[in-house]
C-alpha cells in the first residue's frame, strides 16, 4: 500500500517528490514506476531498462519476507488468469496497476526519506557508537524487520549487526537510490568490490 497512488500521502513517507498526472511534456510525469517493468501486453510504457539481479532476488528470505512479492516479480498474472514468466526478476513495487493500468503518467510520489530509514539510521548509529548492538538498536532494526514478517533474531555483535542493517537497507529500499551510498558508507573498498562482484559477476573493472 505504501506506493499506491491513492495512499501517496501516508505517514511512512516523510519527504518525497510528488509527480503530476496532467503534465505530458517529456519526462515530467511519474513514469519511473513503469520504466522498470518488462514488456507487458496492455502496458504501453514498460521498458525494462533496469532489472534486479539474481543476487538480490536470492538474498531475500523467500518464505517469510513479505517485501519480496510486492517488490520483485518473476512472473505476471493477467486478469484472464494467463501467466507470463520472465527470465529475470523485475521491479514491480512502484506500479499501481489499478490507478494506471496502461502505465501512463500518475500522481505517484517517489520517496526520498521514509520512516523505515530513520529506524535503520538509529540502529546503524548505535551499533557504531557502542561497537555492538544494544537493546535500543535491536528494537530499531526489528521495527523494520517485523513489519516485513521477519521474526528471527539478529546477531548483536558489531560485525554481525552491521551486516544485518546493511541487508535491511538493501531489501527495504530497492530502487530508491540508497544502495551505492549504503555500500560506500558501511563497507571497506575490498568489501564493496566483493559485494558488487557477487551481484554482477559479468561486470568489468571499468564498470566498477
Kindly give the residue locations of the regions a language model identified.
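Active-site-adjacent substrate-recognition loops and nearby beta-strands
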Residues: 25-35
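Acidic/polar-rich alpha-helix caps and helix-coil junctions
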Residues: 1-27, 62-208
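Short, cationic low-complexity segments
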Residues: 35-51, 56-57
Amino acid at each position: 500500500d505504501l506506493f499506491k497512488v491513492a495512499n501517496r500521502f501516508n505517514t511512512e513517507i516523510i519527504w518525497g517528490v510528488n509527480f503530476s498526472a496532467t503534465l505530458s511534456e517529456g519526462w515530467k510525469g511519474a513514469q519511473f514506476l513503469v520504466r522498470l517493468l518488462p514488456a507487458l501486453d496492455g502496458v504501453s510504457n514498460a521498458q525494462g531498462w533496469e532489472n534486479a539481479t539474481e543476487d538480490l532476488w536470492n538474498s531475500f528470505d523467500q518464505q517469510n519476507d513479505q517485501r519480496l512479492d510486492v517488490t520483485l516479480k518473476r512472473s505476471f498474472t493477467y486478469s484472464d488468469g494467463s501467466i507470463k514468466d520472465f527470465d529475470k526478476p523485475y521491479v514491480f513495487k512502484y506500479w499501481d496497476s489499478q490507478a494506471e493500468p496502461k502505465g501512463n503518467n500518475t500522481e505517484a510520489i517517489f520517496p526520498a526519506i521514509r520512516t523505515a530509514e530513520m529506524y535503520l539510521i538509529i540502529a546503524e548509529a548505535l551499533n557504531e557508537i557502542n561497537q555492538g548492538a544494544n537493546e535500543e538498536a535491536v528494537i530499531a532494526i526489528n521495527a523494520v524487520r517485523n513489519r516485513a514478517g521477519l521474526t528471527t533474531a539478529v546477531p548483536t555483535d558489531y560485525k554481525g549487526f552491521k551486516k544485518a542493517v546493511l541487508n535491511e537497507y538493501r531489501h527495504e529500499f530497492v530502487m530508491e537510490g540508497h544502495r551505492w551510498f549504503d555500500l560506500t558508507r558501511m563497507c571497506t573498498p575490498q568489501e564493496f568490490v566483493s559485494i558488487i562482484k557477487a551481484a554482477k559477476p559479468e561486470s568489468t573493472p571499468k564498470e566498477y
